[in-house]
Amino acid sequence: MADTAATFVFADIAGFTALTEAHGDEQAAALVDGFANEVESELPPGATRVKSIGDAVMLRVPDPGEAILLGLRMTRDVLREHLAFAVRVGLHHGPAVERGGDYFGATVNVAARVSSIAAGGEVLTTGETAALVPDLGGVLFESRGRHTLRNVAEPLEIFAALRTADRGADALPVDPVCRMSVDPDRAVGRLEYEGTVYFFCSLPCAAHFARHPDRFAAA
């Protein structure tokens, strides 16, 4: 069945593979469950969670402005109450075909590819989608240049959606052990080594670093 246009959003936990390797399957599975539940609680009216794919969620949001605001809430608020990890988001607006509750087509493919190039804490969208909401209050768009995305015929200009108040903010630091992006305000531990401060997602990561600082600082 042909679907009316909507914004498709893909969001996942930055560095999730490294987290699984460092902390094990049980903690990783618990993190995924918490992530999906937090995302569900943030959905605006009319939006739906289409499915979960590993640590990622696929969402359908009727309005592109609401989708961008949702993405910004996820990168700032989802997981912040209990966890220190960063979320990355990619989205694109357009038509798709619905089959058994799932959605297919070029729009969905572009949204997924855009999410794959986002950094932790970043909300990326296409120029076409950003142009639909030029006056979204408190939000600005910064070009990230043109990108060639897998299985997308033409290069697309990609934009980062930013809260006006956050413009110029530094990127999130990375846990040197598990390579997870870490929110400094929620980091479980921090250590200084040779003049550099390192932030950690967990006490085990901090302990690993303390035992072998040369190995992890070099990485």
What is each stretch, according to the model?
Residues 1, 128-218:
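Intrinsically disordered, glycine/charged-rich C-terminal tails and inter-domain linkers
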Residues 1-69, 77:
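Catalytic NTP-binding/metal-coordinating core of nucleotidyl cyclase/transferase enzymes
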Residues 3, 58-168:
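Catalytic beta-strand-to-alpha-helix segment of the class III nucleotidyl cyclase homology domain
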Residues 11, 62, 125, 200-201:
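A conserved hydrophobic position in a structured secondary element of the catalytic/binding core
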Residues 38, 77, 114-117, 208, ...:
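Conserved short hydrophobic interaction patches
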Residues 42-46, 81-83, 183:
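Short secondary-structure junctions
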Residues 49-50, 115, 189-190:
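Short secondary-structure boundary/capping segments
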Residues 53, 99, 193-194:
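Structural motif
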